[in-house]
């Protein structure tokens, strides 16, 4: 096989760009949630609320970053099976990764108190900020199953080539979260 044959079989810049631009746009919306939470807490009398959101946010950023393998592995496995045109295997992958996401999500909920104690040891703030951080971690842990399931769905959509739907999903969730934080 010569170079021109390889070039003709490789995806074009345009076909790659069609997949990547929605993902780029979607990821640009993610800071909206933090900015909204900060703005809402900034209206409170004390800066302690902003500190608590920041400290608790660090905890969940680390957790979710560590679990990003759910999206990445789902994307890779689903795209391979899509290339093989194996819908049954795609369904199995979705069931398996959703089961893993739900199990880990409930594990995070059940571990919220030890997680809070570890966070207090590793992240220091004022006594009031740590108390509010504890509440934030406790309540936000209940969103873990849905957050992790969302990672799986994003992986599926990207894996089957529906990057625009993944973008719509992330943008919608970010906007909805911002609206609900304000209300």
Tell me what each language-model feature is.
Residues 13-32, 36, 59-66, 142, ...:
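Residue-level signal for short hydrophobic patches within transmembrane helices
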Residues 35-39, 118, 152-156, 178-183:
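Alpha-helical transmembrane segments of multipass membrane proteins
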Residues 41-61, 127-135:
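Interfacial/gating helices of multi-pass transporter permease domains
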Residues 50-110, 147-161, 165-166:
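Small-residue-rich hydrophobic transmembrane alpha-helices
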Residues 156-183:
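Alpha-helical transmembrane segments of multi-pass membrane transporters/permeases
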Residues 1-20, 78-145, 183:
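Short alpha-helical transmembrane segments in multi-pass integral membrane proteins
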Residues 25, 37-41, 53, 78-83, ...:
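Hydrophobic/aromatic residues within transmembrane alpha-helices of membrane transport systems
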Residues 23, 31, 58, 96, ...:
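Residue-level recognition of pore/gate-forming positions within transmembrane alpha-helices
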